[in-house]
């Protein structure tokens, strides 16, 4: 399948090609500049100010759900993958194995509970669902994203005002965002979630880290030493949320350099393919109903797009984005989402 904007022709000799030697050199310069900015400006300033807060005993906050439950899907596949079926090739190729849920991190790294997110989980309607009880959509049942419905039902504020609001209808519908649940529970996603998951998995010997995951653990250990505060204390704090964004920027800058090097090596070896187009034409699609999901870790957290194809047409498409997890309205059983809890 080909996503719009992805296939850019590669030619080292053609000056008008979207990707040529001149433009690759410009990309390399930009990558090096980003690494310089993060390492020599962003992080030093961030840590200097953060250290002052720590010395003053102002590592506070800790709202949201980071102490209770965080979720991730994993990111940065090393090589092309064949999807999430057949044992989950996506999970075999990712470099950042944050495909898990960590619960009770606030009680300590070694006391936290880690549950892997697997290929089977993606198909299980008991694992991942969305509800619309407090969202402006019809049908409040908990549905798997493949079965999800998005038929609008806007009801306005508590008094039924649809243009000039007076009071939020907290007991009714009050958001355009659905409520995603993991095994019936709320979860927080984002850079902080990724760092909590990787750090916990490595420290509990559940993951043998590659160079990128080791970098994440070393980053957390270095900050813990600088602040003289345990990771389960500073990571879920307001300071920790801010710091992990900076650490994530440093990691991504290194990832840019790493994958750029792989691209240059591929081109040098004569590999200039930009996409696999075997499934581009709908005539190649099966006539029976098929379902699929695309996963990733966007900068803001766990991202998933779910599609069902029937009779060679898209019959359903649902996106459960990071903000769906963090900014969702409450659930009567699961409680409040990360944003609501923080407020």
Where are these regions (language model features)?
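Active-site bordering "gate/hinge" segments
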Residues: 1-300, 310-311, 316, 321-343
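A translation/RNA-centric and nucleic-acid-associated enzymatic feature enriched
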Residues: 305
């Amino acid at each position: 399948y080909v996503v719009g904007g992805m296939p850019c022709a590669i030619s080292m000799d053609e000056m008008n090609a979207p990707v040529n030697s001149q433009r690759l050199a410009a990309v390399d310069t930009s990558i090096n500049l980003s690494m310089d900015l993060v390492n020599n400006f962003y992080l030093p300033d961030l840590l200097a100010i953060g250290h002052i807060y720590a010395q003053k005993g102002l590592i506070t906050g800790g709202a949201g759900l980071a102490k209770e439950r965080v979720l991730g899907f994993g990111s940065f596949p090393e090589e092309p993958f064949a999807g999430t079926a057949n044992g989950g090739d996506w999970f075999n190729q990712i470099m950042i194995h944050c495909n898990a849920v960590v619960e009770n991190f606030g009680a300590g790294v070694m006391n936290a509970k880690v549950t892997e997110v697997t290929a089977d989980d993606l198909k299980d309607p008991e694992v991942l669902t969305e509800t619309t009880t407090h969202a402006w959509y019809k049908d409040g049942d908990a549905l798997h994203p493949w079965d999800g419905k998005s038929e609008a039902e806007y009801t306005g504020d508590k008094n039924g005002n649809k243009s000039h609001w007076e009071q939020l209808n907290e007991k009714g519908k009050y958001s355009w965002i659905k409520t995603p649940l993991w095994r019936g529970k709320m979860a927080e996603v984002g850079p902080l979630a990724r760092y909590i998951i990787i750090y916990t998995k490595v420290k509990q010997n559940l993951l043998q880290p590659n160079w990128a995951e080791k970098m994440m653990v070393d980053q957390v250990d270095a900050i813990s030493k600088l602040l003289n505060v345990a990771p389960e204390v500073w990571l879920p704090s307001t300071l920790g949320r801010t710091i992990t964004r900076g650490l994530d920027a440093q990691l991504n800058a290194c990832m840019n350099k790493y994958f750029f090097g792989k691209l240059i090596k591929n081109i040098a070896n004569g590999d200039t393919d930009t996409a696999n187009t075997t499934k581009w034409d709908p005539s190649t699609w099966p006539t029976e109903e098929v379902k699929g999901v695309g996963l990733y870790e966007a900068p803001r957290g766990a991202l998933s797009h779910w599609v069902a194809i029937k009779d060679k047409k898209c019959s359903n498409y649902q996106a459960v984005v990071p903000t769906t997890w963090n900014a969702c309205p409450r659930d009567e059983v699961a409680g409040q989402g990360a944003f609501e809890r923080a407020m």
